[in-house]
């Protein structure tokens, strides 16, 4: 078969891409010789080099259909023709072409590049390119929504990832075992330095914990305790600190499953000291407020905003509410922004600056605390309506001799009494007592005098709750799926990184929707973050020996990249990074990895 004849060709570079042009010579009457006339683009050299395979433009192939049957490659000044099979590819191409899911991981790469996460991982985990492996596993958790790493190898075979080689289950286990506590603490330290670059502003950290269940009996921290998912399984507890400004989780620690939340503040403060964090305000929910925790914060000069429990009769918060009831009845106490009635009480708090176990507290030190009280009449009315509806339903069932549910029996015992003349009647005094503190919230703080700012800081702690929802629901990490203590540290850290990246994705989508609403634009993105990433994951990338090429991106996928504030991947090639294959060795002796 005779090769077709190429027209005159020029090679011109634009940016990082070499383009192929053809031209025609024309006669110059003045110079009395031929010269090069107008040129026309006919193709692109693949691979980003001056030599390589040529991808001809469709317009050229329509004019010269004979070139459809050949792969043309530029080598030096020569052009090599390779016949193409009926399937449209050469045999060499058939061996080396590979399609990868790439759009979602491309977007995640851009988000990582805009944050300190990738840089800090590289600094802390440079060996064996572990930082790339950690990111790749984090992407797997985000896109696969399952933390069973036995699925990772097949996922990596078909997905564009920072670490381009697939990792076997044993290689993943070795990675987890290499992630040591000192390296994790180094990462936390770098994150702390990043947050404290703006020395003028306080760092507000939302603090909370959750329980993660396990079937394993080998892990040190696994104990039966108060399971927050109502699983009848032993658990370990994981505590997160989340920066409320950026939404980034910056610290975690796990502890025994039978340790209540209220007991963890002291250890967290100790960890804070290790991190050498300054100018920090801890924001925590009711489970963390106690006299001991307030004292520990004051002793260690850690500022705090705690939500106070109101369920205990005779507690200080209830007394303060009762003292200020007239203020709550005054409509002028309502704030137009948070839509709550507000009152604040200053309390002179006594504490022992140097407590010793077993000795009575000296209470020689004192601090001024602010008890900010908030009343929402709507919440009160909702509680009153719900209770009234339940009590009237019970009354109706009793009159019609219908059976009561277990919950209704409890309400009957609590709010009804037998009257000799009227029979079973509702005791209004008990109802009033039950509703007396409904609609109230009390925040105690040593530093924030402004009640609205305190409320806002507390309201923003949804970020840590969002972190746990992301970890357990969206990433499928409600089970540990690890039975080795040495690997647990590494797996938890990878899940921590995945949680942070997922929260950054959600934050960008929220910001996009908020800006559209502010500008009065039509919001074209309604799907959840996971749905958006799944759609983008179907943006494919074709891999050749000489590079990677994204398929054309069109339609709503362009809008999704815009919602994530990342650029659409271009047509130019990505050059694959060569990484050595990790040798297959067994996990460290004495380990038992459940995957």
Task: Name each region found by the language model.
Residues 453-481:
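Short amphipathic alpha-helical "interface-anchor" segments enriched in bulky aromatics
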């Amino acid at each position: 078969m005779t090769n077709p004849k190429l027209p005159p060709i020029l090679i011109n570079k634009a940016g990082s891409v070499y383009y192929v042009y053809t031209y025609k010579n024309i006669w110059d009457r003045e110079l009395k010789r031929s010269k090069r006339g107008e040129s026309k683009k006919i193709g692109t050299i693949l691979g980003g080099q001056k030599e390589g395979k040529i991808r001809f433009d469709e317009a050229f192939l329509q004019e010269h259909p004979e070139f459809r049957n050949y792969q043309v490659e530029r080598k030096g000044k020569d052009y090599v023709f390779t016949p193409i099979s009926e399937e449209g590819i050469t045999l060499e191409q058939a061996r080396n072409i590979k399609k990868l899911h790439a759009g979602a991981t491309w977007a995640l790469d851009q988000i990582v590049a805009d944050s300190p996460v990738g840089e800090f991982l590289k600094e802390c985990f440079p060996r064996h390119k572990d930082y790339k492996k950690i990111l790749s596993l984090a992407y797997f958790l985000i896109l696969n929504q399952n933390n069973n790493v036995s699925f990772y190898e097949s996922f990596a075979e078909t997905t564009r990832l920072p670490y381009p080689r697939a990792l076997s289950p044993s290689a993943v286990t070795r990675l987890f075992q290499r992630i040591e506590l000192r390296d994790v603490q180094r990462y936390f330290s770098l994150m702390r330095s990043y947050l404290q670059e703006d020395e003028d502003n306080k760092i507000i950290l939302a603090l909370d914990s959750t329980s993660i269940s396990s079937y394993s009996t080998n892990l040190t921290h696994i104990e039966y305790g108060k399971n927050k998912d109502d699983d009848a399984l032993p658990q370990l507890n994981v505590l997160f600190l989340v920066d409320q400004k950026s939404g980034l989780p910056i610290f975690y620690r796990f502890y025994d499953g039978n340790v209540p939340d209220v007991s963890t503040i002291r250890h967290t403060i100790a960890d804070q000291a290790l991190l050498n964090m300054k100018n920090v305000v801890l924001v925590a929910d009711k489970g963390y407020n106690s006299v001991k925790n307030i004292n520990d914060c004051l002793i260690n000069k850690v500022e705090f905003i705690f939500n106070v429990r109101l369920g205990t009769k005779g507690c200080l918060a209830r007394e303060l509410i009762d003292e200020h009831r007239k203020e709550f009845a005054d409509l002028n106490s309502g704030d137009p922004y948070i839509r709550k009635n507000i009152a604040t009480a200053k309390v002179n708090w006594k504490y022992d600056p140097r407590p010793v176990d077993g000795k009575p507290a000296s209470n020689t030190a004192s601090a001024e605390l602010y008890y900010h009280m908030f009343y929402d009449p709507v919440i009160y009315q909702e509680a009153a309506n719900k209770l009234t509806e339940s009590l009237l339903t019970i009354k109706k069932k009793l009159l019609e001799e219908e059976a009561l549910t277990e919950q209704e029996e409890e309400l009957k015992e609590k709010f009804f009494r037998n009257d000799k003349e009227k029979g079973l009647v509702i005791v209004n005094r008990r109802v009033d007592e039950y509703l007396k503190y409904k609609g109230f919230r009390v925040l105690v703080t040593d530093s924030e005098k402004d009640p609205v700012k305190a409320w806002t800081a507390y309201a923003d702690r949804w970020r840590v709750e969002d972190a746990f929802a992301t970890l357990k629901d969206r990433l499928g990490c409600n089970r540990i799926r690890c039975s080795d203590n040495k690997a647990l540290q590494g797996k938890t850290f990878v899940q921590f990184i995945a949680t942070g990246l997922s929260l950054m994705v959600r934050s960008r989508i929220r910001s996009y929707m908020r800006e559209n609403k502010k500008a009065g634009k039509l919001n074209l993105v309604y799907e959840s973050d996971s749905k958006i990433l799944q759609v983008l994951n179907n943006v494919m990338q074709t891999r050749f020996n000489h590079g990677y090429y994204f398929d054309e991106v069109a339609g709503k996928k362009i809008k999704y990249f815009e919602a994530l504030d990342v650029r659409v991947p271009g047509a130019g090639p990505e050059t694959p990074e060569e990484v050595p294959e990790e040798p297959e060795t067994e996990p460290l002796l004495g380990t038992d990895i459940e995957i």
